[in-house]
Amino acid sequence: MKLKRAYSPGEVLNMKIPRYEFTGDWQASIGNPAKSGVWIIWGASGNGKSSFVMQLAKYLCGFGRVIYDSLEESTGLSFQMSLKRHKMDEVRKRLVILDRESMDQLEERLQRRGSPGIVIIDSFQYSGLNYKTYKEFKERHPKKLFIFISHAEGSHPAGRSARKVEYDADVKIMVSCFNAWCKSRFMEKPGEPYVIWEEGAAKTLKDDNMEDYLNGMGE
């Protein structure tokens, strides 16, 4: 078996690794992330997860074309209302919405020349992936950024496979109390909470265990 090339520290430091230059609240929460890899976002119902994902998708459209594969919610009324509430028509030229497109169909789409570089998959549980097929999928597309939305079980993604993805992901984001709590490999410490909805966040008591949770998030 042919071995892969080995590198010196200097060679790695001199590599030009593409990254996004985030600003403002997004940079404070996530840093300046690589343009490829995996993120995972999870949270209990009613805490602002859907709104956060829409806000994130809209922000990422400022950097390039984004696929949103709505596996769980489809393109029904609630999804339509969310698009309207966040004025997603403003990024209509860069946001590609897929109505429950299977992972096989999505894979075929991603193999096309010029396919979008950012892919939001909502949700991991509806994708049908397990940890093995997830790893194979992401390794076939090393230049893409995949953002998986997940159900929550306690303070972690729901299910064994999603929990493993939490540990594998470059950016892990838990949505709670209308805040997005981020832990990113592109920052030396957990980022500042991203406030999804100020009024809702102000009315919700702060979780006293949040600091302990952040310390226990997947590395």
Language-model segments: what does each one mean?
Residues 35-104:
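Conserved P-loop
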Residues 139-219:
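Phosphate-binding/switch region of NTP-binding enzymes
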